[in-house]
Amino acid sequence: MEYLKMDESHVEAIAELEKMCFLDPWSANSIASELHNPLSDWFVAVDNGMVCGYVGSQSVLDGADMMNIAVHPDYRKQGIGYALIERLITALKEKNVISLCLEVRVSNESAIGLYSKMGFAVVGKRPGYYRNPREDAYIMRKEFAK
C-alpha cells in the first residue's frame, strides 16, 4: 500500500469512491478544485494502482478541518483509514497546524471508534447536519503534541 499526495490522476477514482461510499458525493470537479486550493491537503491510499482510500482537509491559520475520508468497502478494517489520517496529521504538523476537527454522523460507530482511538474527542454536536438521511453530527477534535 502506498500513501501519496493526491494529484490529477487520482480525481476520477476518488469521485467513483465518493459515489460508492456516500449518498451525497462530491463531484470530480469539486475534488479537482482542491488540487488548486493552497489551504487543502489530500492524500490517497493506492494498492497496485487502484485508489482504495483518500482523506482531505482544509487548514486556516493553526487549525484544520477534515473535509472527507473514505475507504473502499473491500479494503475496510485493514488500517487504511488510520494510516491516511496519520499521513494527513504529519503534513499538517509540517504546516504548523496544531489541531484537526471533523464532523461524523452520530450513528457511525465504526468511524467514531477509529477517531477516538486516534485521540479525537467529541467537543460538540451539530443538529441536522447531514441529509440523506437527515442526522446529527458530532464535532470531534484532536490537538497535536507540539
Please report, for each region that a protein language model flagged, where it lies by residue:
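Conserved acetyl-CoA-binding loop-helix of GNAT-fold acetyltransferases
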Residues: 77-91, 109, 113-117
